């Protein structure tokens, strides 16, 4: 299976650089994965596609203000993208610099000195030397780390709009974007309809934006991300399936979390890292349907939806979305695959 099989041409003007005024005003492409039938709806119509007894599973991870700036002691400028916090004074980060900082050197993160303890590939391990911790630095100076394809600096509204309304557990470098369409009003309508809701956590890493670099899909090595699938979520899933309801994952992060916890065919609580890679030929044990945004060409996420719905059907759906001028990627429109 070739990575190029998952390529497609997207007109640049269809990349959504800004969100719509209202979260739930986006469009929704409905795809029947059995028949391949495609239909166009508004996102608010999603309420009509779910039934009492269904279970929606959301990722409640919160995006960190992970973009920070600083300098070497020489004054040379540095840009940070915080990837993972080990403890309040110890964290992993990407660093953009003309010349990479050396292991053992001291550098500034905003106004605070930090020591470079280690480097692994493009990832640095830093320890803060000053009084402030990384949470305080992000709170005081941090920027929302918008995806590179938006080609703009973050603005004030991004702090709210690049965050789901139910975000709770701080740790992501990118938003679980399928959830961005859900307004507080729509969440209430879902509850009022008798549809159950559950929350898992997957802290999205920056690797989510990276295209697959190898020619053969099977050779790709996934980046690891931290997830939590609590026992009460597993109980809800078992109950839903026993009662004939559907488990509907909101976003590929929820899909990957649930399928990690259900790898042995039976859903079990899971806490730790996952590097699960779902591509055509892989089996789904837990998820019956999903809401997802449109994904980048050659990405692991377009491979995931192709595994769920069949590659030809996904490519046709994407061609339809391009012809109908859907908006793509993080601030773009969504699909309901069932």
UniProtKB/Swiss-Prot annotation:
Pathway: tRNA modification; tRNA-queuosine biosynthesis. It catalyses: 7-aminomethyl-7-carbaguanosine(34) in tRNA + S-adenosyl-L-methionine = epoxyqueuosine(34) in tRNA + adenine + L-methionine + 2 H(+). InterPro entries: QueA (IPR003699), QueA_dom1 (IPR042118), QueA_dom2 (IPR042119), QueA_sf (IPR036100). It is an enzyme of class 2 (transferase). Keywords: Cytoplasm, Queuosine biosynthesis, S-adenosyl-L-methionine, Transferase. Its main location: cytoplasm. Pfam families: Queuosine_synth. It is found in: Cytoplasm. Its EC number is 2.4.99.17. One of its GO terms (molecular function) is S-adenosylmethionine:tRNA ribosyltransferase-isomerase activity. GO terms for cellular component: cytoplasm. It comes from the Bacteria. One of its GO terms (biological process) is queuosine biosynthetic process. Disulfide bonds: none annotated. The keyword Transferase applies. NCBIfam families: PRK00147.1 (NF001140), queA (TIGR00113). PANTHER family: S-ADENOSYLMETHIONINE:TRNA RIBOSYLTRANSFERASE-ISOMERASE (PTHR30307:SF0). Monomer. Transfers and isomerizes the ribose moiety from AdoMet to the 7-aminomethyl group of 7-deazaguanine (preQ1-tRNA) to give epoxyqueuosine (oQ-tRNA). Belongs to the QueA family. This is S-adenosylmethionine:tRNA ribosyltransferase-isomerase. It comes from Francisella tularensis subsp. tularensis (strain WY96-3418). The gene is queA.
């Amino acid at each position: 299976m070739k990575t190029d099989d998952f390529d497609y041409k997207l007109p640049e003007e269809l990349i959504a650089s800004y969100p719509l005024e209202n979260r739930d005003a986006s469009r929704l492409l409905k795809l029947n994965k059995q028949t391949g039938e495609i239909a166009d709806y508004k996102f608010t119509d999603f309420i009509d596609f779910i039934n009492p007894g269904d279970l929606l599973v959301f990722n409640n991870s919160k995006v960190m203000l992970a973009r920070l700036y600083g300098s070497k002691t020489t004054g040379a400028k540095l840009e940070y993208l915080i990837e993972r916090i080990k403890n309040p004074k110890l964290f992993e980060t990407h660093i953009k610099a003309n010349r990479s900082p050396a292991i053992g050197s001291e550098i500034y993160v905003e106004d605070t000195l930090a020591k470079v303890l280690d480097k692994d590939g493009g990832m640095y391990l830093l320890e803060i030397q000053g009084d402030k911790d990384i949470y305080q630095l992000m709170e005081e100076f941090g920027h929302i780390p918008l995806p590179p394809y938006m080609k703009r600096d973050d603005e004030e509204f991004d702090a709210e709009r690049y965050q789901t309304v139910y975000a709770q557990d701080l740790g992501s470098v990118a938003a679980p974007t399928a959830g961005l369409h859900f307004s507080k009003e729509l969440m209430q309508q879902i509850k009022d309809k008798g549809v159950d809701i559950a929350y898992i956590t997957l802290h999205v890493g920056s690797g989510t934006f990276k295209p697959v670099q190898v020619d053969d899909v099977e050779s790709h090595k996934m980046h690891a991300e931290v997830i939590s699938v609590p026992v009460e979520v597993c109980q809800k899933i078992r109950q839903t399936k026993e009662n004939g309801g559907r488990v509907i994952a909101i976003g590929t992060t929820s899909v990957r979390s649930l399928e990690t916890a259900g790898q042995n065919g039976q859903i079990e609580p899971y806490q730790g890292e996952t590097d699960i890679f779902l591509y055509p030929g892989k089996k789904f044990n837990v998820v019956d349907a999903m809401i997802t945004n449109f994904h980048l060409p050659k990405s692991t996420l377009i491979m995931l939806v192709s595994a769920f719905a069949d590659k030809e059907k996904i490519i046709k759906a994407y061609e339809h979305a391009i012809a109908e001028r859907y908006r793509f990627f993080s601030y773009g429109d969504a699909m309901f695959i069932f």
